[in-house]
Amino acid sequence: ALRIFAYEYAYILAPSDHDAQGIQSGWDIKRILGTVPVEEDGSALFTIPANTPISIQPLDKDGAAIQWMRSWLTGMPGEIVSCVGCHEDQNSIPIPKRTIASAKQARRLETPEGGVRPFTFRLEVQPVLDRNCVSCHNGKNAEPDFRKDQMVTYKRGILTKINKQYDQSYLNLHPYVYRQGPESDIYVLKPAEFHASNSELIRILQAGHHGVEVPEEDMRTLYAWIDLNAP
């Protein structure tokens, strides 16, 4: 399947820096628009909202991104947008042959449960921690502390003197995530270079963390969080 998400760019006078949406998470808010299946020949045909910056991530069977698209595309109303693949020359054209997807009607995106919304730690990830982790990671029995509603001031920078309010649980969890920074070198990533399984968080859970069995849907939420650069 493909995960389709959109960038919600910052408005004038809105906070705009590497830490605006999370620690080194990027400049902009991201909204998951939905997923769409991929045909056996690798083709896909689907509709997207017009005049919206769109990014695409191919997913594995568990719902984790195999590759990251570090750019975006937009479509005008009624426009047909096509691409030849993540690793192909941008000046090349598709092979002139019929694909499985082209013989079918364009699919509508399967929107996430609860609808399209900004993907935030407090709304998406904290409930996963509440259900699976906080019974032990409660500031008393085990560290780190993953309880909610504990706001702290995060200070960064010698020249900029940035002070921001973050959830303590976010500050405690994000170091366990392996992801690219907001201004990484511009090169084509190797497939699975930043796969969620490379993050210590996922490795701990998959290895069996004190008998905790995180439900599949909650794991998919963690995968999405990692794939969006841990906002």
Task: For the regions a language model picked out, list residue spans one by one.
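Extended low-complexity, serine/threonine- and proline-enriched intrinsically disordered segments
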Residues: A1-S25
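Short, surface-exposed beta-strand/beta-hairpin micro-motifs centered on an aromatic residue
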Residues: D41-T47
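Generic marker of residues within folded, mature protein domains
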Residues: G26-D28, V36, F46, L73, ...
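Short, acidic Ser/Thr/Gly-rich low-complexity loop/linker segments typical of extracellular
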Residues: Q21-D41
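N-terminal start-of-chain detector that recognizes signal peptides
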Residues: S16-D19, W27-K30, S55, R108
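Short, structured secondary-structure elements
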Residues: A6-A10, G26-D28, A44, I54, ...
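Aromatic- and Gly/Pro-enriched helix-to-coil junctions and flexible linker segments
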Residues: P49-P53, Q57-W72, M76-P231
